[in-house]
Amino acid sequence: MSRLDEVLGTAILKGKKALGKEAPEVLRLPLDLLRVRGQPRRRFENLEALAESIREKGILQPLLVRRVGEAYEVVAGERRLRAAAMAGLKEVPARVLDLSEKEARLLALVENLQREDLNPYEETLGVLALLSEDLGKSVEEVVGLLRKMKNAKEGRVRDNVVPTAEAQRVEELFKALGRMSWESFVQHRLPLLSLPEDLKAALEEGAIPYTAALELKKVKDASLRKALLEEVKAGLSLRELKARVRGVLRKEKAPRPWPKEVAAKLARLDLEALPPERRARVEELLAELERVLEGPR
């Protein structure tokens, strides 16, 4: 029994039995009786290739489902189901498991987290969903709990602000998942939740690594960020990106010219040498400045 089995209990054990000697018999279920559930995996890549493989060889691994009323809910195998529909199949092989709603949610979340093609953003949502399900809290409450745990560890709040039992459970789950510590998750993954939409999209598409997304997040100017994003997609290294971002941030923080410097530039300015439109704009601004300066104090 693995650490994850011990922590999450019967849901995972039932899923493993479905793949072993105690597996229920394989049934052929019509596609129109199958329903999918919400899950952290939003993208389904290479469906056409899988659909072609299914046309040639069929579905090699049965779906895992549970009975819900007159239909069946897919617990594991949504990608195969979608590809089967693309391939024109009318029915698919499946094993029916006796799972409660909570067990089904846990098993589906763990199945998705164990996939190799989850990108960091989807994985982050999946981990939060798993914690939410296990702790009986909303995702927002889980995020708040994790941040309180971090603050408590760093001595910024009193320890008793964080419920001990919940903190211990969080630590157990992260150890069982074996991916990263909860501290690393808070530091490196929670910031992904507040990414601008363009960076979220690029991350979900697998176009950029999450480290680049976090670096690009520092650039507030959308047009500059877009230009840098395209460079990252074209192969700009993280080291080069960090240097570019530092340059952008330096310019953003640079002090604006002092009045004397502006006055010196105006003294050197030859208005007659400017193009008509630009000269008219400068004269308009100078007139506005004069009105402001001569106004009541």
UniProtKB/Swiss-Prot annotation:
SMART domains registered for this protein in UniProt: ParB (SM00470)
SUPFAM superfamilies (UniProt xref): KorB DNA-binding domain-like (SSF109709), ParB/Sulfiredoxin (SSF110849)
Keyword vocabulary terms for this entry: Chromosome partition, DNA-binding, Plasmid
Keyword DNA-binding attributed: yes
Family annotation (InterPro entries): Chromosome_partition/occlusion (IPR050336), ParB/RepB/Spo0J (IPR004437), ParB/Sulfiredoxin_dom (IPR003115), ParB/Sulfiredoxin_sf (IPR036086)
Gene Ontology molecular function: any one: DNA binding
Entries under Pfam families matching the protein: ParBc
One GO term (biological process): chromosome segregation
Keyword Membrane in annotation: no
Any one Gene Ontology cellular component term annotated for this protein: chromosome
UniProt record similarity statement: Belongs to the ParB family.
Function summary: Probably involved in plasmid DNA partitioning.
Protein name (Swiss-Prot/TrEMBL): Probable plasmid-partitioning protein ParB
Organism: Thermus thermophilus (strain ATCC BAA-163 / DSM 7039 / HB27)
Gene name tied to this protein: parB
